[in-house]
Protein backbone atom coordinates (compact mmCIF):
# COMPACT_ATOMS: atom_id res chain seq x y z
CA UNK A 1 0.00 0.00 0.00
CA UNK A 2 1.16 3.55 -0.63
CA UNK A 3 -0.67 5.28 2.22
CA UNK A 4 0.63 2.81 4.80
CA UNK A 5 -0.30 4.66 8.02
CA UNK A 6 -3.76 5.59 6.72
CA UNK A 7 -4.38 2.06 5.45
CA UNK A 8 -3.25 0.55 8.76
CA UNK A 9 -5.72 2.83 10.57
CA UNK A 10 -8.45 1.97 8.06
CA UNK A 11 -8.07 -1.80 8.45
CA UNK A 12 -7.77 -1.63 12.25
CA UNK A 13 -10.98 0.42 12.35
CA UNK A 14 -13.20 -1.43 9.90
CA UNK A 15 -12.06 -4.98 10.66
CA UNK A 16 -12.59 -4.69 14.43
CA UNK A 17 -16.37 -5.34 14.12
CA UNK A 18 -15.45 -8.55 12.24
CA UNK A 19 -13.31 -9.58 15.24
CA UNK A 20 -10.08 -9.02 13.31
CA UNK A 21 -7.36 -7.00 15.04
CA UNK A 22 -3.89 -5.61 14.41
CA UNK A 23 -1.43 -8.27 15.62
CA UNK A 24 1.83 -6.46 14.90
CA UNK A 25 3.24 -3.56 12.93
CA UNK A 26 6.62 -2.14 11.99
CA UNK A 27 7.79 0.47 9.47
CA UNK A 28 7.22 -1.78 6.46
CA UNK A 29 4.24 -4.02 7.23
CA UNK A 30 1.25 -4.65 9.48
CA UNK A 31 -0.35 -8.00 10.22
CA UNK A 32 -3.99 -8.60 11.15
CA UNK A 33 -5.65 -11.71 12.52
CA UNK A 34 -8.67 -13.04 14.37
CA UNK A 35 -9.06 -11.84 17.94
CA UNK A 36 -8.04 -14.51 20.43
CA UNK A 37 -5.71 -16.22 17.96
CA UNK A 38 -1.97 -15.81 17.48
CA UNK A 39 -1.68 -16.12 13.71
CA UNK A 40 -1.74 -13.38 11.09
CA UNK A 41 -4.22 -13.95 8.29
CA UNK A 42 -3.99 -10.62 6.45
CA UNK A 43 -0.91 -8.50 5.77
CA UNK A 44 -0.40 -5.03 4.30
CA UNK A 45 3.03 -3.87 3.16
CA UNK A 46 4.37 -0.42 2.41
CA UNK A 47 4.97 -0.16 -1.32
CA UNK A 48 4.39 1.59 -4.60
CA UNK A 49 1.03 2.30 -6.15
CA UNK A 50 -0.30 -0.76 -7.89
CA UNK A 51 -3.66 -1.67 -9.27
CA UNK A 52 -6.48 -1.38 -6.78
CA UNK A 53 -8.13 -4.61 -5.75
CA UNK A 54 -11.30 -6.01 -4.22
CA UNK A 55 -10.96 -7.82 -0.88
CA UNK A 56 -13.91 -9.52 0.80
CA UNK A 57 -14.04 -10.46 4.48
CA UNK A 58 -16.63 -12.96 5.70
CA UNK A 59 -18.80 -11.69 8.56
CA UNK A 60 -20.72 -13.89 10.99
CA UNK A 61 -24.01 -12.06 10.34
CA UNK A 62 -25.64 -8.92 8.94
CA UNK A 63 -25.05 -7.07 12.22
CA UNK A 64 -21.29 -7.40 11.71
CA UNK A 65 -21.58 -6.22 8.10
CA UNK A 66 -23.53 -3.17 9.27
CA UNK A 67 -20.97 -2.48 12.04
CA UNK A 68 -18.08 -2.75 9.53
CA UNK A 69 -19.71 -0.13 7.31
CA UNK A 70 -20.74 2.12 10.19
CA UNK A 71 -17.20 2.07 11.66
CA UNK A 72 -15.75 3.12 8.31
CA UNK A 73 -18.24 5.91 7.69
CA UNK A 74 -17.91 7.21 11.27
CA UNK A 75 -14.10 7.31 10.84
CA UNK A 76 -14.45 9.32 7.63
CA UNK A 77 -13.70 6.65 5.03
CA UNK A 78 -15.42 6.48 1.66
CA UNK A 79 -18.53 4.37 1.10
CA UNK A 80 -18.48 2.19 -1.98
CA UNK A 81 -21.78 0.39 -1.37
CA UNK A 82 -24.31 0.63 1.43
CA UNK A 83 -25.18 -2.44 3.52
CA UNK A 84 -27.83 -4.54 1.85
CA UNK A 85 -28.76 -7.60 -0.13
CA UNK A 86 -26.89 -8.26 -3.37
CA UNK A 87 -29.28 -10.60 -5.24
CA UNK A 88 -27.06 -10.46 -8.35
CA UNK A 89 -24.49 -12.46 -6.31
CA UNK A 90 -26.97 -14.74 -4.52
CA UNK A 91 -30.52 -14.28 -3.16
CA UNK A 92 -29.29 -14.12 0.43
CA UNK A 93 -25.90 -12.40 -0.12
CA UNK A 94 -25.65 -9.42 2.25
CA UNK A 95 -22.70 -7.03 1.93
CA UNK A 96 -21.31 -3.53 2.41
CA UNK A 97 -18.36 -1.89 0.69
CA UNK A 98 -15.80 0.77 1.63
CA UNK A 99 -12.79 2.23 -0.18
CA UNK A 100 -9.46 1.99 1.62
CA UNK A 101 -7.15 5.05 1.44
CA UNK A 102 -5.39 3.56 -1.62
CA UNK A 103 -8.72 3.14 -3.44
CA UNK A 104 -9.21 -0.61 -3.09
CA UNK A 105 -12.75 -1.93 -2.69
CA UNK A 106 -13.08 -3.58 0.73
CA UNK A 107 -16.16 -5.70 1.40
CA UNK A 108 -17.74 -7.34 4.42
CA UNK A 109 -20.24 -10.03 3.46
CA UNK A 110 -22.39 -12.80 4.85
CA UNK A 111 -25.29 -14.98 3.82
CA UNK A 112 -28.57 -14.34 5.60
CA UNK A 113 -31.52 -16.66 5.99
CA UNK A 114 -34.02 -16.06 3.21
CA UNK A 115 -36.82 -15.63 5.76
CA UNK A 116 -35.01 -12.52 7.04
CA UNK A 117 -34.27 -11.03 3.62
CA UNK A 118 -37.41 -8.88 3.36
CA UNK A 119 -37.02 -7.50 6.88
CA UNK A 120 -33.34 -6.82 6.26
CA UNK A 121 -34.08 -4.82 3.10
CA UNK A 122 -36.49 -2.58 5.00
CA UNK A 123 -34.04 -2.16 7.88
CA UNK A 124 -31.26 -1.25 5.44
CA UNK A 125 -33.20 1.62 3.91
CA UNK A 126 -33.64 3.19 7.35
CA UNK A 127 -30.07 2.50 8.44
CA UNK A 128 -28.56 3.87 5.23
CA UNK A 129 -30.13 7.27 5.88
CA UNK A 130 -28.73 7.28 9.42
CA UNK A 131 -25.24 6.20 8.33
CA UNK A 132 -24.94 8.91 5.72
CA UNK A 133 -26.15 11.61 8.06
CA UNK A 134 -23.08 10.79 10.20
CA UNK A 135 -20.59 11.46 7.41
CA UNK A 136 -21.78 12.12 3.87
CA UNK A 137 -18.47 13.70 2.84
CA UNK A 138 -15.25 12.42 1.30
CA UNK A 139 -12.78 10.21 3.09
CA UNK A 140 -10.77 11.73 5.89
CA UNK A 141 -7.40 10.08 5.25
CA UNK A 142 -5.58 10.76 1.99
Label the predicted regions.
Residues 32-37, 46, 98-101:
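Active-site beta-strand termini and strand-to-loop segments that position acidic
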Residues 40-45, 97, 106-110:
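Conserved beta-strand in the GNAT
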Amino acid sequence: VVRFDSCQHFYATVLAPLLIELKWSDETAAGFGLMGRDHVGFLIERGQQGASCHLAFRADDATQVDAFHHAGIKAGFACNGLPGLRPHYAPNYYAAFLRDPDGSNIEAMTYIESSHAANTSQHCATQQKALHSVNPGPEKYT
